[in-house]
Amino acid sequence: MPAKGREFYIPHRAVIRENAETTKMRIVYDASARANDTAPSLNECLDAGLLLQNQLWKVLVCARFYAVAIAGDIHKAFLQVRIREEDRDTLRFHWINTEYPEQVRALRFTHALFGLAPSPFLLGGAIQHHLSICRPDYPETVLEIEGGMYVDDLLSGGQTVGKAREIKGTAREIFGKASFQLHKWNSNARELEVTDTVDDESGVTYAKEQLGAKPGECALLGLRWNKDADTIAVTFPQEVAALTKRGILGKVAKVYNPLGQAALLTLVGKLIYRDACQQKKAWDADLSKELVKCWEMW
């Protein structure tokens, strides 16, 4: 397919996860890759747009006010947003012809893709526009959705199972009008998780795998949600850090703690890193025996 103007080929690679129950291989497209040190990446050439999503901590806190919480997400959300035909040549990629492996085909995306700088803005703008159209017919639910959306995730609920079921049903109806499918429903009221789509079958997703989620738990915007006890928890990475300044900084930085629940614990790790910096050691130099002892106790 000959290009008619601007043109960019996005590199991609396969990510293999042998332990996954469903998708063992994912294709990752890297729009931040550069051809060389002086060439800009595709993302550097694009305007990321306005920040339209809600604040993460606000969505999480508001969801905790409901006695009955529900959480779902939009199925393949970015791929539901179509790109103008005149812009699609910037989303080209190479693909090996399965029938003739010696041939390489040039394909292009017709919809927004994950990892593209403007994709969150394009998705957020599409959702906001659609909700504005639906507002006259569903004023209460639209307001609820607007406060509970974070990119493609919806957190909502009610003080009773009946109210939460009503919100869930109306939200599915609203998004369905724009061909968005809400799926992967989770709730602390298990009867609300029953679905009529094969797409919602439970399994060890990548998010669950990363969080080390157990049966009855799921990922809630990156936190581990125990639906039976209705508690959320912070996950600490299990891998052993190198006993260097770089190693302990990497370990502390991997603790995802958006609500500050584990602040008292992470503070100790940060203080150890501060002490390592004050000793003016190189990034990969071994820590002193005193700091190693403190780190191992932490």
Where would I find each of the regions flagged by the language model?
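Conserved acidic
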Residues: 1-298
